[in-house]
C-alpha cells in the first residue's frame, strides 16, 4: 500500500475529529455540519477499502499534524493561506431536504465512476426540478455533496451522490451523471428542469427555462444506461 495513501487517510481522520469537536461545541453552521456527516461516511468507506482502523489512524494523523505545526512558522502559514484559492459552498437544498429519507416503488440504480445514480421509475408525468449542494472553485463545480430530484409536491424521486469508498470526481463526471438521471426521468414523460445554481456551474446546456437541451436519441441512450442495476 502506498505510504502517501495511508498518511493522507490518517490526516483526514484527525482533521475530521477536530471538526467533530467544533460541531460538538455548536460552532459549526449548516454547510459545516453537512460536510462533516458526508465526510464521516467517506472515511468509513476508505477505512474499509484500505483495511485501516479509524481510531488508530486518527492518532497517527494527530502526530503528523503536530509535527508539521511545530515546523511551521506564522509567516509561512500566512503565505500558504494567501496562495490557496478559496472554494464556495452553494446550497439549493435545506439540511432537512438533504437528510430526509426517501423510498422508491420501482428502484433503479447505476454507478458511474465514483457517483451513484438512483431514481424511482414508477414516477410518471410529473414536473421535476433537480437541486444540489456542492462546492465551487474558479467558477466551476469542485465537489458534489448531494443532488436530488424533487416533484412539485416536494417528493424525492431521484438522487446522485458520491460513493464513500471512491472519493474524487470532476465536474464532467457530475454533468454526465445528471444527463443519465434526466434521461431516465424523461423516459417516463416527466418534465425535468435544473436549478439556476446547477445551470450556472454544472449543467450549462440548458435552455432559458432551465430545461435540459437533450436530443431524443440522447435521451433514449441515457435512459437505457440506468437499466444497469447494482
Curated annotation (Swiss-Prot):
Q: Say if the entry is tagged with keyword Ubl conjugation.
A: yes
Ranges for region PABPN1-binding: 223-230
Q: Where is this motif: Nuclear localization signal?
A: 34-38
* Pfam families assigned: Flu_NS1
One molecular function GO term is: RNA binding
List, alphabetically, the InterPro entries matched. Answer: NS1, NS1A, NS1A_effect_dom-like_sf, uS15_NS1_RNA-bd_sf
Per the database entry, which stretches of residues form a coiled coil? none
Q: Name one GO biological process term.
A: symbiont-mediated suppression of host gene expression
Per the record, the major location class is host cell
Q: Where in the cell is the protein located?
A: Host nucleus; Host cytoplasm
Family, according to the entry, reads as follows: Belongs to the influenza A viruses NS1 family.
Q: What is this protein called?
A: Non-structural protein 1
Gene giving rise to this polypeptide: NS
Amino acid at each position: 500500500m502506498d505510504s502517501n495513501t495511508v498518511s493522507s487517510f490518517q490526516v483526514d481522520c484527525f482533521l475530521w475529529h477536530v471538526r467533530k469537536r467544533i460541531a460538538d461545541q455548536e460552532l459549526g453552521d449548516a454547510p459545516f455540519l453537512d460536510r462533516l456527516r458526508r465526510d464521516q461516511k467517506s472515511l468509513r468507506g476508505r477505512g474499509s477499502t484500505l483495511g485501516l482502523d479509524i481510531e488508530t489512524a486518527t492518532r497517527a494523523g494527530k502526530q503528523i499534524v503536530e509535527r508539521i505545526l511545530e515546523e511551521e512558522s506564522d509567516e509561512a502559514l500566512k503565505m500558504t493561506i494567501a496562495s490557496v484559492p478559496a472554494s464556495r459552498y452553494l446550497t439549493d437544498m435545506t439540511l432537512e431536504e438533504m437528510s430526509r429519507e426517501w423510498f422508491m416503488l420501482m428502484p433503479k440504480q447505476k454507478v458511474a465512476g465514483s457517483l451513484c445514480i438512483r431514481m424511482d421509475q414508477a414516477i410518471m408525468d410529473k414536473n421535476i426540478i433537480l437541486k444540489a449542494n456542492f462546492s465551487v472553485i474558479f467558477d466551476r463545480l469542485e465537489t458534489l455533496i448531494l443532488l436530488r430530484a424533487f416533484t412539485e409536491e416536494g417528493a424525492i424521486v431521484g438522487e446522485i451522490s458520491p460513493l464513500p469508498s471512491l472519493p474524487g470526481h470532476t465536474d464532467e463526471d457530475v454533468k454526465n451523471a445528471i444527463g443519465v438521471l434526466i434521461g431516465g426521468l424523461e423516459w417516463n414523460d416527466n418534465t425535468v428542469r435544473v436549478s439556476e445554481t446547477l445551470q450556472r456551474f454544472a449543467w450549462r446546456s440548458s435552455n432559458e427555462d432551465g430545461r435540459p437541451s437533450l436530443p431524443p436519441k440522447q435521451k433514449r441512450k441515457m435512459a437505457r444506461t440506468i437499466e444497469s442495476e447494482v
